[in-house]
Design a protein with these regions (language model features):
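DPxDG-like acidic metal-binding loop motif
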Residues: 1-8, 12-16
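Long, positively charged amphipathic alpha-helical accessory segments at protein N-termini or as interdomain linkers
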Residues: 14-32, 42-174
């Protein structure tokens, strides 16, 4: 297999996100969404977080899913668990299977199709958000995730593209 370029590697959190979302939907029906860049939401609350790190010439994808754990009271308004006993081995296998399917499509040059699918589950779409990057704060309306993985944000009638940043959703839109 060919080595991923840095540009391609920036798409791994999105690929892992849609793969995990797809696997979870096959295990438990419900309202799933993808929050750019690395979270899966279930009924408006965070169910899963994804972390991708480089290890020498490889990339390690970490996926944390709240399966049956009790959510502490202080974060119940923003986090959720699947609240059921699931066969963890089956869940892991389904996530790996879905990642393999999506990675194959990605390798075959079908990223445009995948990004459209991701946007179908875009949790931020049309929400008023605040993006923190260092000591700078940007506010606007989230739009689509574009081909290169950046998020479009409409600010003062103009579309700006963001590749990083901590996202806060204005409460009125959440």
């Amino acid at each position: 297999e060919k080595e991923l370029s840095i540009v391609e590697a920036t798409k791994l959190p999105l690929l892992a996100g849609i793969s995990t979302l797809s696997a979870l939907k096959k295990i438990k029906d419900g309202a799933y969404f993808f929050k750019w860049t690395n979270d899966v939401f279930f009924y408006g609350k965070k169910l899963c977080g994804i972390l991708v790190e480089r290890a020498k010439n490889d990339f390690v994808v970490g996926i944390g899913i709240n399966v049956a754990n009790k959510i502490p009271d202080d974060i119940k308004n923003i986090a959720i668990s699947m609240e059921s006993d699931y066969d963890i081995d089956k869940l892991i296998l389904k996530v790996v299977e879905e990642f393999s399917v999506y990675y194959k499509r990605f390798s075959e040059g079908k990223w445009s199709e995948i990004i459209k699918e991701i946007n179908n589950y875009n949790f931020l779409k049309d929400k008023k958000i605040r993006v923190n990057i260092g000591d700078k704060i940007f506010e606007g309306i989230a739009k689509n995730i574009v081909e290169d993985g950046r998020l479009e944000i409409e600010m003062n009638g103009e579309i700006k593209l963001f590749s990083v940043g901590e996202i806060k959703i204005e409460k009125d839109y959440y």
